[in-house]
Amino acid sequence: MATSASGLPPYVAAEHQQQLKHANRVAMLMAPRLGDTLLMMNMVQNLRANGRSVTVFGDYAYALRAWFPGIDIRPSLPESEASHALADYDCAAQMHVGWPYGLHDYARSYFYYDEHVVVTGKGFIKLNQIRDYCHQQLGLENCSLNNGLRPLPELRHRQHLRRVAVHPSSGGEERRWAASHFVELGKRLQRSGYQPFYILAPYEREQWACLAENGLSIYPSTLLSDVATFIHESGWFVGNESGIGHLASNVGIPTLTVTGRPTRTLSWRPGWSTSRIVYPGYIPGGRLRDRLWRHWLKPRQVLRAFRQLTDQYEKQISE
């Protein structure tokens, strides 16, 4: 079936699937999103595990290149250089249609993952969906949930068992739990014997001054690799729906995601380590949902879900 996005030529999914299926040299272009990058690295790893040569272009992957040993990872490919750079590959692939840009003018064959699957829905986890697509549709025999990430050898996994890495920011306000609730959650975690640390980029610290004003500790993130290190050596992770949550799961840390969109978050939730989501008991539709869930989901509910996560994880590792 042929589909087309605005400004792009018709896309015949069956033809483009065959192009990727038979490609020996693949260029994987990553969207400028951390979570999407980590998920699509699963396709990269499954292609590589079945004898394909894959080059990754993406700034988030490049920032974590030491965590992906043996994989050819380069910075994002500027569109002005795409025609020349992609000429050496049998197929160029990316998750989204036309993002970071359309590939039709630059690659001999190309592939948009989103054109072949249900993007958001019930009954699946995105990471599992990518693995299953690689096996069932691309015909790759050796497929797993592994995306090639390996913690740096000098690190100690969950060295600080009572430390909780908390990520209060997100890509949009509608995904961001209320700041006052993050403050109260931190205080409740402290009273429960945990050590919450809030991960913030330098430019976010002013916006989140309420955390330091209430005596809560800040981890000032600068390099993404350092953030991965900090989370990998923490015991737990709590945050909004964001790429940092996927990173936490990917480095082996149990994750709790706070959300007002449970259907979307269930399918897009972190999938490498133990994870749970928590959301209000009642959520209206449309814009009301995006405005109100942030306040309706209370800290006591999130702390209860956090305790359920700790119980679940500790039971799993004891079995």
Where are these regions (language model features)?
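Catalytic machinery of carbohydrate-active enzymes
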Residues: 1-319
